[in-house]
A protein has these predicted regions:
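Conserved HGGG/HGGXW glycine-rich cap/lid loop of the alpha/beta-hydrolase fold
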Residues: 7-57
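Active-site loop/oxyanion-hole signature of alpha/beta-hydrolase fold enzymes
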Residues: 42-83, 122, 267
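Conserved loop-alpha-helix segment in the C-terminal half of the alpha/beta-hydrolase fold
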Residues: 209-253
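Post-His helix in hydrolase/transferase enzymes
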Residues: 259-271
Length: 276
């Protein structure tokens, strides 16, 4: 099948954005718009957003790497600038290792590089991959509202969205929430998919540490100072495994940094790219 993608627009060299778990790429309008002023921006659409896909049939999260490889081969893309956030950053890195010709540079923003101690602890606990708070939080997430305004009001009260502007939150609501066919609205990226990726990453997340020493592209490595994903142990290990990368910690942001400060994060990427 043809892998779907979003054409954000713009002129210049191709830049591919890989979106995170649970967030469709259209949500990141404010982050992608400045990038499209200097680059032609595309964003692959991950399989949870395709029709007729079943999360319970997913056995390996790296199927997203296979999908990205397929997309690049179908479009004939090479020497692309790869930008990824969270799960999308991990997928971009692994794709770059398997097909170095696809990418000229990488910008990895708070990637899901789970620290070895977390992976080891999960391996020692029965049902850790299903009982983890992130997995349970995803499965218990509210997924039905009367309309988009009700969804916006619900999210506006949530502490996790405190730093999001109203415009950023509306970008999420308008692009991540869709009619359910019965008069209400629901999540476009199903919560079962979100939970499935959390579960598989706890079981299989060590793959990123094995691959990092093989990255050959110039890399911008960004960690949100208030992240709960890329903890200090993982950040230090990344620096040891890829010492040639540019490492930057972004202040006053959490894991959702490109929604909290989209323009500042876009400028950070643009400045690094401009340095050559």
């Amino acid at each position: 099948m043809q892998i779907p993608f979003l054409d954000v627009g713009g002129d210049g060299p191709i830049l591919h954005f890989a979106h995170p778990n649970a967030y469709p790429p259209e949500c990141f309008r404010q982050f992608l718009a400045p990038l499209s002023e200097q680059y032609h921006v595309f964003a692959g659409i991950q399989r949870p957003l395709w029709a007729n896909q079943k999360p319970e049939e997913l056995a390996d999260w790296q199927v997203l790497v296979d999908d990205m490889i397929c997309l690049f081969e179908q479009q004939g893309w090479q020497n692309v600038i790869g930008v990824g956030h969270s799960l999308g950053a991990a997928v971009t890195m692994l794709t770059a290792v398997r097909h170095p010709e696809f990418f000229s540079k990488l910008a990895l923003l708070d990637p899901v590089f789970l620290a070895p101690s977390l992976l080891q602890a999960a391996a020692q606990i029965p049902d850790a991959a299903t009982q983890n708070p992130y997995v349970q939080g995803a499965l218990n997430r509210r997924n039905l509202w009367t309309d988009k305004k009700a969804a916006f009001t619900h999210y506006r009260r949530k502490r996790v969205f405190n730093r999001w502007s109203d415009a950023a939150l509306w970008d999420y609501v308008n692009n991540a929430i869709v009619p359910d066919g019965s008069g209400d609205v629901t999540l476009r990226y199903k919560r079962e998919w979100e939970a499935r990726f959390y579960s598989l990453l706890l079981q299989q997340g060590g793959a990123v540490w094995e691959a990092l020493p093989d990255v050959r592209q110039p890399t911008l490595a960004v960690r949100a100072l208030e992240t709960d994903t890329l903890i200090p142990e993982g950040w230090q290990l990344w620096q040891e495994l890829q010492p040639g990368a540019t490492f930057i910690e972004a202040p006053d942001v959490s894991h959702l940094l490109i929604m909290e400060r989209p323009l500042a994060m876009a400028q950070l990427v643009l400045d690094w790219l401009a340095e050559g």
